[in-house]
Amino acid sequence: MLEQQTCAEKAANTVNTVELSTDQAKKINLMNLTRQQMREFFKELGEKPFRADQLVKWIYHFGEDNFDNMTNINKKLRDKLKQVAEIKAPEVAVEQRSADGTIKWAMQVGDQQVETVYIPEADRATLCVSSQVGCALACTFCSTAQQGFNRNLTVSEIIGQVWRASKIIGNFGVTGVRPITNVVMMGMGEPLLNVANVVPAMEIMLDDFAYGLSKRRVTLSTSGVVPALDKLSEMIDVALAISLHAPNDELRDEIVPINKKYNIKMLMDSVNRYLSVSNANHGKVTIEYVMLDHVNDGVEHAHQLAQVLKNTPCKINLIPWNPFPEAPYAKSSNSRIDRFQKTLMEYGFTVIVRKTRGDDIDAACGQLAGDVIDRTKRTAQKKQFGQEIAVRNH
């Protein structure tokens, strides 16, 4: 049974945290709080709740992390805040810039690093955000999964990626231009294995006092943690993308191992339930399908995929696979991708081949790795799997 805190429980926990911070001189990171939680925080300080609205605007519109610069907040309150609170986002450890304009940042989270990718285009600027240090799902074609898993990111470490990127590019409150128009939870980790922190972070993204993004411009991508997906619609409404990658259970069991627990039918039934109550998806889910040469890219696979998706309103993104060291796969040829796309289009599906961005700096889909202290022994397991695939393909 998936356990989640209600808003009231979270607010109560926030209050307890504030008391703990005051008593033990341990400062609370305000980036861990939604605006509603921050209003509770100010009430506990004996202040008017509207101060939270002012503070959220300073933090996210203006990228401000120094209380002394918040000039519409009186000095007495600023001094009080400095005693009990802080505003702290991950720092950039490494920045890499691609020839196509893509930027990848390795963000320092404790003694490890996660990766965040900024993808500018003519009509939008998308930020790809990580939700975990590593990933426990062990998808065989993904570089992140080969690093193993260490821990979930906190709310501040998730929303802090957006904050740090916005500060580098130019905050809305300073430039008058949104530095980021879209956020995709498609970085390192499985977001639905960290809903307790991912959902509040997305709430901040949607909050008009913070980033004010449309719910259609915040996308959560999942490999299919069905109980959490069923719970998600009760917590927040955002755009949904499904990392499907295979048209049958036998193949998906192998390349997306969570399928052994929640098979394709269970997943698609859950997707349809989500779509039935969501306003963020224009009635359609995005299906992500990585193209692996002679693994899942045959015409027969396209026909099978069409049958899987026939009762689910969707658009399909075909993703050319991006190689990483020691991977046991090859990239599908353009001709195989084209044939796969045309086969699906004959069924009436909208099918897009995703343009690869940032592959020269290992920032493309499936290439994010970061610096992870593995707690899952995945690094050792991947060597054995690679040897098995090599023998099978020989």
Curated annotation (Swiss-Prot):
One of the record's GO molecular function terms? tRNA (adenine(37)-C2)-methyltransferase activity
List positions binding S-adenosyl-L-methionine: G189, E190, S221, S243, L244, H245, N322
- What biological process terms from GO does the record include? rRNA base methylation; tRNA methylation
Q: Where in the cell is it found?
A: Cytoplasm
So which domain of life are we looking at? Bacteria
Q: Which residues are listed for [4Fe-4S] cluster binding in this entry?
A: C135, C139, C142
List cofactor names only.
[4Fe-4S] cluster
Alphabetically list the UniProt keywords.
4Fe-4S, Cytoplasm, Disulfide bond, Iron, Iron-sulfur, Metal-binding, Methyltransferase, rRNA processing, S-adenosyl-L-methionine, Transferase, tRNA processing
What enzyme category does the UniProt record give?
Answer: transferase
Q: What is its main location?
A: cytoplasm
Q: Which GO terms describe its cellular component?
A: cytoplasm
Role this protein plays: Specifically methylates position 2 of adenine 2503 in 23S rRNA and position 2 of adenine 37 in tRNAs. m2A2503 modification seems to play a crucial role in the proofreading step occurring at the peptidyl transferase center and thus would serve to optimize ribosomal fidelity.
**What family, per the record?**
Belongs to the radical SAM superfamily. RlmN family.
The record's listing under HAMAP family reads: RNA_methyltr_RlmN (MF_01849)
Extra information? Reaction proceeds by a ping-pong mechanism involving intermediate methylation of a conserved cysteine residue.
| Full protein name | Dual-specificity RNA methyltransferase RlmN
